[in-house]
Every structure is written in C-alpha cells, then in structure tokens.
Swiss-Prot record:
Cofactors (names): Mg(2+)
Record's catalysed reaction(s): dUTP + H2O = dUMP + diphosphate + H(+)
Name of protein: Deoxyuridine 5'-triphosphate nucleotidohydrolase
Alphabetic keyword roster: Hydrolase, Magnesium, Metal-binding, Nucleotide metabolism
Annotated positions binding substrate: R64, S65, G66, N77, T81, I82, D83, K91
Alphabetized GO MF terms: dUTP diphosphatase activity; magnesium ion binding
HAMAP family reported for this sequence: dUTPase_bact
Entry's EC annotation: 3.6.1.23
InterPro entries noted in UniProt: dUTPase, dUTPase-like, dUTPase-like_sf, dUTPase_trimeric
NCBIfam families (alphabetical): dut, PRK00601.1
Any Gene Ontology biological process: dUTP catabolic process
Pathway: Pyrimidine metabolism; dUMP biosynthesis; dUMP from dCTP (dUTP route): step 2/2
C-alpha cells in the first residue's frame, strides 16, 4: 500500500527527493547550498523542498550511512523529526565528526534520507505510580543506560 506525500520544490534547480533503489525505505534529500564543515563543526543545511506529512505520520531525517562511514558526516539530532503540522523547508543539521579533515558539501549532493512512518498518537494519562496503575513488575524495571550489559572490554 502506498501513501501520497505532497512536496513543494522550493529550489527548481534541484531534483526532487528520490529512492536510490526500488523498495528503499527512504528518499534522498539534496543540499541546496555549498557548505564547508571544519572538524567538529555543524551547519543547518537547506534542502530546497517542503513536504506536507499526513496527520498520523511523521517524517524522520536520517544520515546517509555511506557519508558517515566514509567521511564522518552525520546529523546532529538523528533522526530529525518532521511533524505533520510543519510546512516549512526541510533543513538538515549536519555535523563533521572527522577529528582532522574538513568536509565540503556541494549544492546537489545527497546529504540525508527522509523516511515517512505511521505514528501512534497516544493520550497521556497521569498516574500516581506504576504500581498503583498495575503497570509495574517488568523484568527491566527502572534499569537503563547500560543495565543490560556492556561491551566485552568495558
């Protein structure tokens, strides 16, 4: 089943986002500008497109794995969230994680990928405690941040 996504091309000189391969989950987003990122620096990069995410769905902007592996280019707030009510240009908060080399992003480079997924819009219900609400007693409890074990050498 396919859902349509309305998209506005704000920069007619750029291609629309597209899938690299049939069946890929995400569509590639392109940089609308040239950007030089020094080591450890970040920049908010325009993509030249805006989308109308349908109600009950969310857009998630993920890094491109090849850029992360090859040159250390990633996204600061990964994944970036595009809520259904947002109608502005998609911008990507890129960061250069390479400790020594600058990264140059050129206009038209593929910089991120957009995935659109259904989301459950829950209603928050305040309870005084999980015990009283009958929601306590899991095997994990309040264990977090490393509670399931660490790396073999740590």
């Amino acid at each position: 089943m396919s859902t349509s996504l309305a998209i506005v091309r704000l920069d007619p000189g750029l291609p629309l986002p597209s899938r690299a391969h049939e069946g890929d989950a995400g569509v590639d987003l392109y940089s609308a500008e040239d950007v030089r990122l020094e080591p450890g620096r970040r920049a908010l990069v325009r993509t030249g497109v805006a989308v109308a995410i349908p109600f009950g769905m969310v857009g998630l902007v993920h890094p491109r794995s090849g850029l992360a592996a090859r040159v250390g280019l990633s996204i600061v707030n990964s994944p970036g969230t595009i809520d259904a009510g947002y109608r502005g240009e998609i911008k990507v908060a890129l960061i250069n994680l390479d400790p020594a080399e600058p990264i140059v992003v050129h206009r038209g480079d593929r910089i991120a990928q957009l995935l659109v997924q259904r989301v459950e819009l829950v209603e928050l219900v305040e309870v005084s405690s999980f015990d009283e609400a009958g929601l306590a007693g899991t095997s994990r409890g309040d264990g977090g941040h490393g509670s399931s074990g660490g790396h073999a050498s740590l």
